């Protein structure tokens, strides 16, 4: 393995690749305000557009270099990766444009962070580049936005708290999105479309996506914990006594988030436990209409997944592109500022102790909040080497930099608190 990179070995600490896209611009803006003395460059296909973006950023960004790089030109990606310690990328859908950059970073020993919500892209990244990244010392970290930081880091925080208390391994663990305001980004929709397109074209891909452990290192050593449905219909009281009266529905992002969390457990040598079970739900409230809303939403979600994963290929591409948000577009600043999310994760440990982790953040989850999360992942990889794990390869946020992110969250406006319930 290569020796850890030092600042003197690379020209830049962070390169923001895709800075002309909507979330790319937001991420660059966040780094211009929060990055301090970090050496940052902007990269993409069009130097003119990158210069225009740079002009909209704060004074600290006006000297940031501009790099030309294109997924269609592997040599440009290789050059970019060789010049920086970390690349953060918002260029998606990742199944179309992501692997050449993963390859460049894995070869150069360069750390990488993205926003992908595409399970099969992550699976291919693992299969093709995990070993090489281990050998070169690169950390290839997927899922560094709303997909799947709140899920991944909430469970990691619970693990750390239970470990500190000597309360034993985590058992049944349930994430519940309690509050949410904001839109789904065009990039997230594009990722979902790519997943549906791939699964409807290939039954083997569909079977892999249905496997709860499709992203783990060694499928053969995963425990048999029985059915683990992705979009369950559950009453709140069946999750935790504190949720009595609340009704929930399946959370669409669970199809991806749950796989990331289970991969974290595997990468951390099953630190959460061999009997760790994980599921996600979304609250629909406690009103008189909530039971009906819960049942209808759950049926609708399962129907969308079942039909989309089998028949999406029959929809004309132009029709789909006309009716969904386009990647690179997004809401107004006022809308982004008004958004928020709050999620609670409940767990019961092997000793019977019960814990709750609550994570919350102001800002539209798909845009402002995601840009902060991605920016903080880039800063953690570049600056907090002493707090990163010893793992290299294709990783998750918790496995790569769980402790570093826990330390960074408060200053970034992300609250993540754990309490013991019993």
Regions found by a protein language model. Name each.
Residues 30-37, 268-270:
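A short, Lys/Arg-enriched amphipathic alpha-helix followed by its capping loop at the start of a domain
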Residues 53-62:
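Short, conserved SAM-binding/catalytic segment
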Residues 13, 85-86, 111:
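Structural motif
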Residues 12-33:
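N-terminal Rossmann NAD(P)H-binding glycine-rich loop of SDR-like oxidoreductase domains
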Residues 2-7, 160-422:
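C-terminal catalytic/substrate-binding lobe primarily of soluble NAD(P)-dependent oxidoreductases
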Residues 93-213, 263:
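Glycine-/Pro-rich loop/turn segments that contact NAD(P) or position catalytic residues
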Residues 67-86, 90-96:
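Conserved Rossmann-fold cofactor-binding substructure of NAD(P)-dependent oxidoreductases
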Residues 36-49:
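Conserved glycine-rich Rossmann-like NAD(P)H-binding loop of the short-chain dehydrogenase/reductase
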